[in-house]
Amino acid sequence: MSSEFLAELRWEDGFAIPVANEENKTLEEQLSKLQDERSSMQDQLRDYEDRINAMTSHFKNVKQEFLFTQSLCKARDHEIESEEHFKMIAERELGRVKDEIQRLENEITSIREKKNDKENSIFKTTQKLDGLKCQMNWDQQALEAWLEESAHKDSDALTLQKYAQQDDNKIRALTLQLERLTVECNQRRKVLDNEFAETLSVQLELDKAAQDFRKIHNERQKLILQWESTIEQMQKRDKDIDNCAVALARIKQEIREKENLVKEKIKFLENEIGNNTEYEKKISVADRKVLKCRTEYQRHEANRIQLKDELDSLKATVNRSSSDLEALRKNISKVKMDINEETARLGKIKNHNQIVRKKLKEITEKTMSVEEKATNLEDMLREEERGVKEVEVQLNIVKDVLFKKVQELQTETMKEKALVSEIEGTRSSLKHLNHQLHKLDFETLQQQEIMYAQDFYIQQVERRMSRLKGDINSEEKQALEAKTVELQKTLEEKKSALCLLETQIKKLHNDLYFTKKSNSKYRDEKQSLMTKINELTLFNDRSEKELTKAKALKQDLMIEDNLLKLEVKRTRELLHSKAEEVLSLEKRKQQLHTAMEERTEEIKVHKTMLASQIRYVDQERQNVSAEFHERLSKIDKLKNRYEILTVVMLPPEGEEEKTQAYYVIKQALVNNQMEKTGRSYEEEYSFVPMRIYDLVNQVQEINAWCCMSVPRSFQKVTPSSAEYEVKIQLEEQKRAVDEKYRYKQRQIRELQEDIQSMENTLTVIEHLTNNVKEKVTEKQAYVLQLNRETEEQKPKLERVTKQCAKLTKEVRLLKDTKDETLEEQDIKLREVKQLHKIIDEMIVDITQENAEIGVILQTYFQQSGLELPTTSTKGSRHSSRSPSQTSLLSARSSKSTSTSASQTSIKVLELNFPASPLTGSTSRPTSASSASSTGKSRKTNK
């Protein structure tokens, strides 16, 4: 600097250089001190201005937050008012429902009283009819005495006619009154139905209004929650802005401090730039070679992976085809075994029928007359032929069902193959696409590195050209400053755009969540409506059934009325004939004989009618019991399957039972934690490039300043110098920053991949849980349907049991016995054997479906000293029927009663399975055999 200045002044070398005096030196020192004070004061002024701006912005944010909190408080007050209103509406609805329940209970009590009155009247009329029948069954002596008295009193006949006419008039009046009452009842029922429909419509309207109010209330709550979340976000952002302002002031101070250090070290940096360029050229050549090698390696690796995937897919197809072939073979063998078992069963049944026929012939020849033998044999033959036909029909149905199931299995296997092939194809295509993506990412990184190298080289060339030309770099500096300002503006715009996009994404997520909620609500409403429709259809079916029953009862009453009228007419004719033929005793005897013959014929007809009714009732009872046993077996199978599922899904020992919601919540918490860590890494990563960019700008400014003020020094720097050590430290810092930057990038990628995998697993778990929920709902609906059917069948079963009890009483009266007959014992034994057979089949099916339950059942049966039934025991049970039935049909009653009593005693076996999660109260106390046996014992007691 001094040499240049002297050259400009044309100072000769021989003369001494002029130096400032002491006054000038003091002035220069004062000037430098004042300049330092001025710079420090300017720095303080800038700091104060920044603080003032930060405080003003903070004050604005506080005001806005205060307004938001006030509006939130108002919204909360409105919400509390709406909640209170909603509570009042619910209380009113509850009161209305209680009144309705009370009204229904009163109606039920009144209907019960009416029913009791009707039953009492029916009982009284039956007693009267029994009295009339007893009066009709007079002895012959009483008739003769009455005839002798009637011969003396002819006027009694006229009085009887008068009474009969009066009875007819009364009957007509009663029938008219009954018709009038039925018309009134129908009218009242119509009025009641109309009122019921009106109340239902009003109730539906009220329900709709309540639902609309609930929807509006929920929407308002959602808006308030959104509002709260926005306020929280704004508060967080305000805090972040404050922190950023403090950090910015601190960074500015640090920058000012570092600027002084950087100015001193620029000279050393410029000397080393040339060496760095040469080394960078060499490094770029080596990097290109490495990139070529990497690309070749990746290409070979991709080919290897593709070939491996193809090999795996071929292996999977081979394994699948072999498993399908084995499954088809197993199905064919199973079908053949079933056909052989059914044929053997049919042969055993035929042999059993022949043995029973022989035994029946022997017994009937001993005990019955010729006519009764013929009728009974014909009836037995018809029943046996009917049973054989039913067995054949069942065999055909089973064969058709088996054929259909085989066809369905084949179609399902074909579908499964197609789906597996599609999945494998999509997997291979996915792998190929992922490989292409990695390849493209790698290529982009290579291109970016090349671009950076080229840009750096261009900048160096431009600097050299400018230095060679000798241009002043003030314009470049201004241009760079303008560029920095523009870039900062663009950066702020992009930041604002990013914030807007994030808010829009959050809003879209919230909208998506609300739409999903509304869809689920609509589905629930649809399900509730469907259940209501089903209940209405069931109500209609029940009402139709009750109507048919009422019609049948009315027809029976009409028939009984007609029979009574016929009997009355016959008695009148007898009275008239006997009154006219009092004198001739022979005619009287003949008339009595004819009356006795008619009476015996009527008794015979009545007996035949009773026998036919007994047969019909027996058939109905057998059908009802068969249906009831089938449904019980279905329910037990479903319960067993459900218990197996719950056992499989139970947690291991020592751990608490975890529900599906627990896993969903756990997954959501993990996702939230991963998202938070990802955001923190992204924030750190966003600050790193900004710092690098600032450092690059600073270096460029330093270079420009060096070009302006300081001439380039051509002296070489020694390794022992301080500048060389500073350069090494700066290079180490740069390397550390680069390594941190790469490490953070790698962590961000790993976190993104982890988040993606967790989201995929979450979707899979949600899909599985939805499938399980659908299955559970289907099973629950099926169980409810079965329960309804059983409840509908209960009254039928009670009626049938009552009819059976009446018929057994009549049969015992006919046979003059109070003990159980052989037929009753035979029926009970057959029922018990049928029940044993159903239980054995259920146990065999369960053991075939699940081997673990088979092992558990084996242990329980061994503990109780019983044998576990297998497929072989099914056939043996059929063969063991014939000797038991022949022993029952033998003539020795004492032995038959003892065998029936021994066979009806069923051994109860307790199976303590683990508790199911849905019931949760107790484990299943007894097996299906014990439950069904207790049910049978109750029937027999009735």
Curated annotation (Swiss-Prot):
Residues 16-124, 164-424, 457-605, 729-768, 796-826 form a coiled coil. GO terms for biological process: axonemal dynein complex assembly; cilium-dependent cell motility; epithelial cilium movement involved in determination of left/right asymmetry; inner dynein arm assembly. Its main location: cytoplasm. Pfam families: CCDC39. InterPro entries: CCDC39. It is found in: Cytoplasm, Cytoskeleton, Cilium axoneme. GO terms for cellular component: axoneme; extracellular region. Residues 868-942 are annotated as: Disordered. Keywords: Cell projection, Cilium, Coiled coil, Cytoplasm, Cytoskeleton, Phosphoprotein. Residues 881-905, 919-935 have a biased composition (Low complexity). The modification Phosphoserine is found at S894, S902. Belongs to the CCDC39 family. Required for assembly of dynein regulatory complex (DRC) and inner dynein arm (IDA) complexes, which are responsible for ciliary beat regulation, thereby playing a central role in motility in cilia and flagella. Probably acts together with CCDC40 to form a molecular ruler that determines the 96 nanometer (nm) repeat length and arrangements of components in cilia and flagella. Not required for outer dynein arm complexes assembly. This is Coiled-coil domain-containing protein 39. It comes from Bos taurus. The gene is CCDC39.
